[in-house]
Amino acid sequence: MSDDETNDGQRFDRLPATDAERTVEGRATRAEVVDYFTDRFGIPPETFDDYTFWEKGAGKIWIYSGDAPTPIEIEAIGMTCLRTRQEHWKPTTDFVQRVGREASDCVIKLDREQAQRFATGEDQDLEWDGDWGYLIAAHEVAGELEPIGIGLYVHGELRSMVPKGRQRDLES
């Protein structure tokens, strides 16, 4: 196996289009990433037509609007969108806030008080009749449903996954 066929935490590698093109064991494919967002959140696959997906290290997936040579040794390209090398894939807050408006599934609508609590990082007991797992938490603003971030719903509890540095007190 050459250096190009291993994970390198200092280098971005474009995701292979399909499983047949995979050269690094465990690396997600573009098709798997798009299918995940489509199957889990109902985001139309064409949403990703103008984007490329990249992995840096093990399972940190980045989305980039454009093209670049692969592999590429830079600090960042686009934004992180997904963590894949764990039992359950986890979308990032940045991704959800930018692309989450396209989602039709696994979106939990929060009222004002629930949204404020979610933004501060507070976990809360909520009823949800959909799938357990990662959900897009959203709140209506000016007549439009706006994604706040990603939450983990298990056993009747919505756990805020808003990173500590991004948590805000919105009560004032």
Give the residues covered by each predicted segment.
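Polybasic, low-complexity RNA-engagement segments
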Residues: 2-172
